[in-house]
Amino acid sequence: MITAIHNPAIYNGIKVFTAGGRDADEIQTKDIEDYISDIKPEEVKEVTYDEGKASGYIEEIYPLNEYLDNIIASVDMQAIRNAGLKVAVDPMYGVSETSIKTILLTARCEVSTIHERHDTLFGGKLPAPSASTLHALQNFVVEKGYDIGIATDGDADRIGVIDDKGN
């Protein structure tokens, strides 16, 4: 995955996950770095996208539906439906807008979003859901009468939650 995690876009880089979906640890990361540093530029082969697909180097995958199904299966969706929640979402210009909105709409929540436009520069702001970055969501929740506000960082692995009073 290419991400700056919850940092400004200038920190974008490659994030490596293990087969189990966890972050690569220091030893695994060092092994990867050592392997890459041993590659000589003249050894790097170039292929077109079509050649890469045909040769099996590139595999197109579409994991979103399976990801959403797993989340929906692990959450008490009926309890959320019964609550009749009005939810404000702030994906902070990152990648969570489609997934979080789909989950909440499946739970029959009323959903509105701010900062939903995908922007690799995160609107020039720090894409981290923390007290210093949630003012817009806090104001939106209180002014529009939402029950809850949910913010995610740029790559959607951190969350911030605002109650109906803006806390």
Role assignments for model-derived ranges:
Residues 1-11, 140-164:
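Glycine-rich phosphate-binding loop
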Residues 12-144:
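Gly/Ser/Thr-enriched, mixed-charge loops and adjacent short helices
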